[in-house]
Amino acid sequence: MVTCFRTNKHYDHEIRFHLVTAKHNDVVITKRPKDTMYMPDVIDDPNLYVIYVMRDPRDVIVSRHGKNREMYYSNIRLWRELHACARPLFGHDRFLCIRYEDFVNNPDVTQSRITAKFPWLEKQYKFSEYHQHAQVSEKSKVAMRNVRPIAPSSVGVWRKHLGRIVEQQAIHGSMTPDLVDCGYESSSNWETVLDGVLADKSGSLYPEKTHLWLKISQRVNALRKIAIYRRKRRLA
């Protein structure tokens, strides 16, 4: 986004939403997936525009972070929590949901959807030319495993990690309701590919379960961040 659209300011790597600063009328673009959980509480900011990239949760939970290839990054618990926060915003005037699969298969069509939704964004380069112009921080290079052309090579990679899917469903229950709701499957028939597959018990960076005390602590911390953001933006 910061490469292909004109911005007044951006950050070298992911930054928490409440720490972002900008001058009046500045276009500032940030990216931090976990900030999805805060968006329902700040979407009333008339100058906040949200793009939610939805991806097949099976592919999400088999991703590994560039820093630690031995461990899976996310899990179904976290995906469900974040998606539940995004779901109520579908249809909001300043919210746009984009499928990751559409983005990597047709980046320029996806870019056109973004400019149609938010026409004040000024395009500098095509998404398909991103890799020719991108200048990213070292942290981002590590996380993304360097700058590469946008391509669909990561779509459907869950099929190479069936043991991971088996283990996640054993812990969190069937993903079929999630997949049907998001339009990735029409029934539970896909689960037949898991028959006889041994569970992959490799760990996740994020915990599979959160205890009550942690949930309370996280909510208190969230309210603090939301209050800071609203105070900065002078929201009631």
Model-flagged regions — what are they?
Residues 5-6, 118-119, 182:
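A broad structural signal for alpha-helix termini and local helix breaks/kinks
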Residues 122-236:
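PAPS-dependent sulfotransferases, especially Golgi type II membrane carbohydrate sulfotransferases
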Residues 16-43, 209-221:
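Short, charged N-terminal helix-start/capping segments
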Residues 26-127, 136-149:
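PAPS-dependent sulfotransferase catalytic domain
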Residues 1-26, 210-211, 225, 232, ...:
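PAPS-dependent sulfotransferase catalytic core
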Residues 10-13, 18, 24, 49, ...:
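Histidine (H) residue identity feature
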Residues 6, 11-12, 74, 80, ...:
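Compositionally biased, intrinsically disordered low-complexity regions enriched in proline and serine
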